[in-house]
């Protein structure tokens, strides 16, 4: 196993522990708490994949961070912070919408890279909007936290989420996954549109009312791809 992979996991475990302590003291806002919950699932998946104990990794990560802090001068820290571009966290969904449990009558699921696409194929003839919470850097989607499809009544009928065991995805991966979800929903004569935030940063091929511009052949192709169940 690559030593950098192990040390990266150890540091991530310790930093998650620090963030959890901050949350326990009620110092974190909604995006902070949301990322904390998502990252916990990711760390569990990575730990299982690597065969590493999280508690042991957290202690090792603490030692790595302490060693770096001992060697780091205040001036070097200021320069590092100034040179790192800041990402923004954008939210279409409330914390309740993100954490709400939902069920599918006719479940379909597909894994596309490090993203999991789920939808209820029992949904027909509905107006559906896609909402997402994600981070942006350089005016491009950096990391998808969660995307969900909602009917006008507020029911959840589809979802795209990162796989905890396979961290890392590009904005193009997200766009392709959105296309698959849209194609599957439109196959059942649903009308799908994306939120303004998604239009701007993740799904740029939309017309003026926010509906995706997909030709019929591409819709059918995307709908067929979601037939592959995990």
Curated annotation (Swiss-Prot):
Post-translational modification: Upon interferon induction, ISGylated via host HERC5; this results in the impairment of NS1 interaction with RNA targets due to its inability to form homodimers and to interact with host EIF2AK2/PKR.
MF terms in GO: protein serine/threonine kinase inhibitor activity; RNA binding
Intervals of motif Nuclear export signal: 137-146
Compartments where located: Host nucleus; Host cytoplasm
Record's comment describing the protein's domains: The dsRNA-binding region is required for suppression of RNA silencing.
GO biological process: symbiont-mediated suppression of host cytoplasmic pattern recognition receptor signaling pathway via inhibition of RIG-I activity; symbiont-mediated suppression of host gene expression; symbiont-mediated suppression of host mRNA processing; symbiont-mediated suppression of host PKR/eIFalpha signaling; symbiont-mediated suppression of host type I interferon-mediated signaling pathway
KW Chloroplast (keyword) present: no
Known role: Inhibits post-transcriptional processing of cellular pre-mRNA, by binding and inhibiting two cellular proteins that are required for the 3'-end processing of cellular pre-mRNAs: the 30 kDa cleavage and polyadenylation specificity factor/CPSF4 and the poly(A)-binding protein 2/PABPN1. In turn, unprocessed 3' end pre-mRNAs accumulate in the host nucleus and are no longer exported to the cytoplasm. Cellular protein synthesis is thereby shut off very early after virus infection.
A Pfam family annotated for this UniProt entry: Flu_NS1
Keywords: Eukaryotic host gene expression shutoff by virus, Host cytoplasm, Host gene expression shutoff by virus, Host mRNA suppression by virus, Host nucleus, Host-virus interaction, Inhibition of host innate immune response by virus, Inhibition of host interferon signaling pathway by virus, Inhibition of host PKR by virus, Inhibition of host pre-mRNA processing by virus, Inhibition of host RIG-I by virus, Inhibition of host RLR pathway by virus, Interferon antiviral system evasion, RNA-binding, Ubl conjugation, Viral immunoevasion
Species classification: Viruses, Riboviria, Orthornavirae, Negarnaviricota, Polyploviricotina
Family note: Belongs to the influenza A viruses NS1 family.
Ranges where the record places region RNA-binding and homodimerization: 1-73
Region (PABPN1-binding): 223-230
Chain intervals for the UniProt region annotation (Disordered): 205-230
A GO term from the CC aspect: host cell cytoplasm
Primary localisation category: host cell
Assembly description: Homodimer. Interacts with host TRIM25 (via coiled coil); this interaction specifically inhibits TRIM25 multimerization and TRIM25-mediated RIGI CARD ubiquitination. Interacts with human EIF2AK2/PKR, CPSF4, IVNS1ABP and PABPN1.
Protein name: Non-structural protein 1
Keyword Ubl conjugation: yes
